[in-house]
Amino acid sequence: MLATVFVRVFHSFRFVEGVFFMKQPAHSPRVSPTVRLTETAVMIALGTVLSLVKLIDLPYGGSVTVAHMVPVLLIAYRYGNRWGLFSGLTYGALQLLLGMKNLSYATSMWAGLAIVCLDYLAAYLFLAAGAWFKKALPQPAAVSLGAVCACVLRYLCHVISGATVWAGLAVPTAEALGFSVVYNATYMLPETIVTVVAAFYLGSVLDFSKEHLSPRRHTDKKAGFGWRVAAGLVAAATVFADVRLVFSRLQDADAGTFSAAGFAAVPWGLVGAVTLVGAVTIGILWRISYTVRINKDKNNNL
């Protein structure tokens, strides 16, 4: 249902594609406009759902999601920078609809406009960074570096907004820039870690450059591929769990900044246990993958 709504929205703005996206980049998959619009709508819908799933809900404000920006980053990688800009802008507009209550804090029309532009439209416009390194780097590295750039640029948008629009509301104007830098880092740092890990994992196991989405595997390493995929999934889940255990304690509930006392509240024993279990599981899965591949090679040589 949600995907259908987004398809209708995209079709209603087909004139945008006609004006800005007449020529599809040479390195993009050759698919019909309908397929491209449908894929984009589905990925934006997925990102919207993931944005509602909170890995961490911080006490002073801000949250960390389950990599909600990754679907749009992957669409940008798949179809190029210009399409990524369009998709990011659309996604930002949807995030604005979900965060309309923030406009109630605006002290003027111009402040409200700045919130819309900085915290939503510009912040997610840069999801187009998913396409920036497609020609220069292998897919996992290209998507991961694009994710880093998108997160950093989104962070800068929030910092500028906090130092201007929100100055004098939450903190004194003279301290607004310093506060904005630190406060926005309390949720954007873990969000960046989660986003980059998810982007690297998906970029490693799926090929987004082909017309039809398919597993990304070398011909000589097909045997045991499923075990390696499982190992990567365990690695990503381990990082997600550690991020939640650590960063959920680091924001000061009264000041909104990083709290040194929060480090003492982190259950480091549990963090270590989760990391150890994850590492052992990954090792076992990789060993199984290696054994399967070796046995396959032996059978081929018989």
For the regions a language model picked out, list residue spans one by one.
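Mid-bilayer segments of alpha-helical transmembrane spans in multi-pass integral membrane proteins
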Residues: Y120, Y124, A128, C151-T164
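Hydrophobic alpha-helical transmembrane segments
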Residues: L37-A41, V70, L85-L89, L113-C117, ...
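Interfacial aromatic-anchored transmembrane helix boundaries in multi-pass membrane proteins
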Residues: L50-V64, T90-A131, G168-A170
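Alpha-helical transmembrane segments and their cytosolic interface
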Residues: F10, F15, F21-V42, E175-L302
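Hydrophobic transmembrane alpha-helices
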Residues: M22-F86
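Membrane-helix interface motif
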Residues: M100-K101, I160-A170, D242-G256
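Helix-capping/transition residues at the boundaries of transmembrane alpha-helices
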Residues: A76-Y77, G130, K134
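Aromatic-anchored segments of alpha-helical transmembrane domains
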Residues: I44-V53, G92-K101, C151-V159, A237-L245
